[in-house]
Amino acid sequence: MATTTDKQVSPTSPSFVYNLDHEDRNTSLKSGRAVLTDFNEQQFVKFDKGCSIETLLKERTSFIDQLLKKIWEHFFSKDECEQLTLVAVGGYGRGELQPYSDIDLLILGENFIELQPKIVEFITYLWDIGFEVGHAVRNLEDCIEAGREDVTTATNLLEARWLAGNYEQFLSLQNLFNLKSFWPSHEFFQAKLEEQEKRHKRYNDTLYQLEPNIKESPGGLRDIQTILWVAKRHFGASSLQELMQHNFISLQEYKEIQAAYLYLNRIRFALHRLKKRHEDRLLFDHQQQLAELLNHDDRPEHNDSIKAVEAFMKPYYQNAHIVARLNEILLQHFKEEIYHFAEDKIEPINPRFRIINNYLDVVKENLFAKNPTALLEIFIIIENYQHLIQGIRSRTIRLIRNHLHLIDDQFRSDPINKALFIEIFRQPKGVNAAVKRMYAYGILGAYLPSFKKITGLMQFNIFHAYTVDEHTILVIRNLRRFFIKQHAYEFPTAHQIATQLCKPEILLLAGLFHDIAKGRNGAHEKLGAVDAKAFSQKHNLNKNDTDLLSWLVLRHLDFSYVAQKKDLSDPEIIQQFAEKVGTQQRLDYLYLLTLADVRSTSDEVWNDWKNQLFLQLYHNTTQALDSSSSQPRDRVKQAIFNKEKASELLKKRGLIPMHFQGFWQAFEQTDFFNRQSAAEIARITRVLFEEDHEAINIHLQPTTSRGATELIIYMHDRDYLFAQFTQIIDKLDLNIVEAKIYSGEDDMTLVIIYLLNRESTSITDPMILTEIEETLKHQLFLKDDTMPPTQPEPRRIRVFEMPTHIQFQEINEELTELSISTKDIPGLLAKIGQAFKSCKIRVHDAKINTVGEKAEDTFMISSTTNESIHTRHSQEELKQALLNNIEQ
C-alpha cells in the first residue's frame, strides 16, 4: 500500500477539494491538516535522501501557492475575487519558506465591510489547519502610507507577489511602490543599514557566538536578504545573478554567496525538520542533534560527539564569515554608488594609498600584485590615519581578499614584512581597528597559518561564548582598552599598570598567541608557548622579549587558577605564586593578560567578586615580590600583623582590648586572624560586640570590598553546619562563592559566607536581605537537614555530559584539601554538604568557582575530631558518597 511519502501530495487532489467543500467543518479542517502534514513528511524524506535545498524551497512555495489559491477560491466567489487581491509578502513573497515558517499575506481591496466576515473565516481556516499567519488587510492608500512610515512594511511590499484575485489592483500597488518618491534609494539604503546595525548589536556584533541565530546573527540569512533588498530598491534587481549584470558582484563572489545561502538554508531546514516547529537558533542541544542528523556524528564516545559538533559548526562559521564579508563589501559598494559625489574629495597619503570621501583606497588596482608588502602596509595606514578614515572602499577590500594567495612562505620570510607585522602591534593608536580588519579580511590567517587553524573553531562549553579566533580578537580589544584614558574607569589598576609598560606589543602578541594551539592534541598553553617562541625568533625579537612572550603564553592560566581556587589570605600560597612569577614585570603583564582573557570569554563570566579576587592576588603578590615590604611571609606572622592592625582600627572606633579579648581568645587557635584581613577582623569584631547576642546571631553586609554580600553567622558549634546552611541558601536561590568556618574554644562557631544572586551581583534589596536573615534564623533553630527539592537543570547546562573528578591533598595533620570538578547542577553544594554529613566531615573553608557549565570547588576539611582525611579508606568512603549524591 502506497504511503503519503511514495506519491506526490497535491492540494489540487480531488479528495482535498471535495473535503474543502464538506459541510462538516471538522472534516474540512482534518483534510487541510492532513495535506499539509503529508507534504511536510514528503519533503523531510526527500531532504534525508539528499534532495537539494533549492528544489525543496521552490517545491514548497509552489505547493503553498496552490493550496492557498484553492482555499481562497473556496471562501470567495468569482465576483468577490474581483474585489480583492491575495498577495504573498515577506519571506513567502520571495519564495523562501521553511517547513514551519510564518506565511505573510496581504489582502488588498477598496471596500472590505461586506467581505470582512469571509476574510476572517479565510484567515481562521489557515490558522486552524496549521499555518502561522501574518496578515494585513489594506487598501492601496493604506499600503503606501504604512510603507512610508515603516521600512519593514516597505520591505515586505518590495517582495510582494500576486497569488489570486484582482491582478490589476496588484499592478497598481507595484506602480505606486516603484515611484521614486516612495522611499528614495538613498533613504531606503540608510534605513536598512541602520536596521542591520541594530540587529548586529543584539548579537554583540559578532558572527562567532557559540549559539548563533541562522537567520538574524551577523553572517546569517538576513545579511544576504539586506543586500538583495537594497539592490532591488536601487536597481530593480531581484537576484544575485542580476547584480552580476550590473557589475556589482563578480562571478567568484556570486558563487561564494550563493553557496553560503544554500548552506544556511539547508541547516535552517534541518533545524525545522528536527524541532517540528519554527526555530532559527543553533542552541547547544540543537547542534548535537544536527551533527547526528547531518552525519557529523558516527562515533558514540563523548569526546568524539564533541568533535562531531565542532566539525558541524566549523563550516557554519566559514559560510557566515563569507556572508559577513560580502555583505560589508557590497553595502559599501552600494553606498559609493548611491551617495555618489559630483566631485570626490581626494586626499593623497603616499604613492600607493589615498583617501576618497573619508574611505581608504589604493591608487592603482595592481598595487598588491606588484607590491605584496602593501597588504600589511595598509593596516599601518589605518592606524595612523584613523582620525580621517571611516572605512575602506569596496574595491580595495576586494583586492585584499583576491590577493591573499600572495602571502606565502616567501612573503612571511621577507624582513620588511616581518618588521611591518610587528610594527602594527607597536602603534600607539588604532591597533584594535587594524587587527579586527586583518582578521576579517583573512590577513591574520594567511600570515599566521596556526591562527587559520583556530578560525571558526568552537569551544563546546558555556564558559566560552565565542569561537577561539573571535575570543582572541576580543582579548586584543580588551587589552587595548586598558591603555585608553576614556576607559580607565572600568579597571583603574589595569589602566595604571598598562600605561607604564615598556613593551605593550609583547602584551598584545601574548593575547594573539595565548589560545593559538587550541584544537591540537596536547596542552594548548605549552604548544602555544613553542609557537610564540618560534614567532619571536623569526621576527627578531630580543631574548628578553622572546622569553617574556613565550612565558606569558605558557603561564596564561596560572593567575586565574590561583585567584579562583586558592586561599589568597594564606601568605605561603602567595609566596609560592610569587616565586613562580619571579618578577614584578611578569606579574604586571600576566595580570593584564588574564584580566582581558577572562573578560573576553563571555558577558556572564565576569563580576565584581572575580574582579576583587584578581586585584587581591595582584596586590598580595606585588607585596611578596617586594623585598622591602613589611608584609608577613608565614601564617604566624600574618596573624600577629593582622591583630595589631585590627586593634588599631578598633581603638579608633572606641573599642579597647578588654571589650573583645574574650572573643579573640576563643578563636586564637583557628585561622581567623591570618585568613581575614585586618579591616575584616575589626569590622566583624565590632559587629559582634555591638549587637545583642542571641542563640543564633546573623549579620548581613549588602556590599563589601570583595564584590559580594557578606553573611556572618555566630552561633553555638554544631556538627554538619555546612550541610545545613548550604541547603538553606540553595532554597533561597542564592550562590555561595566562598565560606569560612571557624570553631572557637568557647563552643561557638563563626561562619563567614560571601553570597551573590543568580545575576552574579551583590544582594542589596532590603526585602530580600530580611528574608535571608529570617529564613536562616528559623531553619537553623529547627536544625532542618532535609534536602531541598532538586530544581530542573537549566537548558544550557542539561546538554553537557561531564565526569566528576575528586582529588585529595593532605595539607597538614589537621587539614585536607578536597577538590571537586563536576557539572554545575542545581543544588550542588547542598548535595556535597549532605555527603560531608554522612561521612562525618567538618568543613573549615570552601571556595566555590563556577566556570560555565563546570563547577570547580575547593574545600578545606577534617574529621569532627579535627584530623586530616588521610587514610585511603576514609578518602574512598567520602569520594563514593560525593559521587552518589552528585550523579544520582
From Swiss-Prot:
Superkingdom in the source lineage: Bacteria
Cofactor(s) needed by this chain: Mg(2+)
GO molecular function: [protein-PII] uridylyltransferase activity; phosphoric diester hydrolase activity
This protein's UniProt keywords: Hydrolase, Magnesium, Multifunctional enzyme, Nucleotidyltransferase, Repeat, Transferase
Activity regulation info: Uridylyltransferase (UTase) activity is inhibited by glutamine, while glutamine activates uridylyl-removing (UR) activity.
Domain notes: Has four distinct domains: an N-terminal nucleotidyltransferase (NT) domain responsible for UTase activity, a central HD domain that encodes UR activity, and two C-terminal ACT domains that seem to have a role in glutamine sensing.
Function statement: Modifies, by uridylylation and deuridylylation, the PII regulatory proteins (GlnB and homologs), in response to the nitrogen status of the cell that GlnD senses through the glutamine level. Under low glutamine levels, catalyzes the conversion of the PII proteins and UTP to PII-UMP and PPi, while under higher glutamine levels, GlnD hydrolyzes PII-UMP to PII and UMP (deuridylylation). Thus, controls uridylylation state and activity of the PII proteins, and plays an important role in the regulation of nitrogen assimilation and metabolism.
Protein name: Bifunctional uridylyltransferase/uridylyl-removing enzyme
Organism: Hydrogenovibrio crunogenus (strain DSM 25203 / XCL-2) (Thiomicrospira crunogena)
Recorded name of the encoding gene: glnD
